[in-house]
Amino acid sequence: DLPREDKEGKQGFSSLQTLAEECDILTFHVPLYKEGRYKTCHLADDAFFQSLKRKPVIINTSRGEIIETGALLNALDTGLVSDAIIDVWENEPAINLTLLDKVFLGTPHIAGYSADGKANATRMSLDTLCRYFNIQADYQIIPPAPSQPRITADTLSAAYLQMYDPRQDSNALKTHPELFEKLRGDYPLRREKEAYTIVNHPE
């Protein structure tokens, strides 16, 4: 995070090269800057993938242009990466179908599309408007309760898959990639883990 590193100092931050050499999972959460000192467009290009040391899993939930599609395809084909999970794509909604077919999970740009995420975004927008107009508003934004708020599972991973199984969204997109915009626009409301109670499976 170069902008934060410039403001806060180097402590607690790592270079992209260090991450490329040491990480088994690399996940991108950066804004898209197309030029300048903080350029992130095609941050993951051929040179980046060639620098990887541990064949990591690549995850992108930021912006599609952060990863150069051709470079990722080559990295998958040559074993520079173990696998990829992609939620954001270059040239949406006309996404690269070869990449969609190769990735472990591919979803239609739905990061932040949970009911909680939409509620938080609405709350932030209202707060900004209130500050701008110097008014106080009394409001509550309460997402709908999940249909099954009580989760029984042996492990946390099993519990989380009951809350949300990304394979369903991935299968839907891989089956009908031409419906990218519809799958995104008609995305059903789902709650995040704070809305659930997890209990151990009875012995």
Predicted regions and their residues:
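Rossmann-like dinucleotide-binding domain for NAD(H)/NADP(H)
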Residues: K55, T61-E203
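Rossmann-like adenosine-cofactor binding region
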Residues: R4-L97
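Short beta-strand "acidic-cap" motif of Rossmann-like dinucleotide-binding folds
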Residues: D1
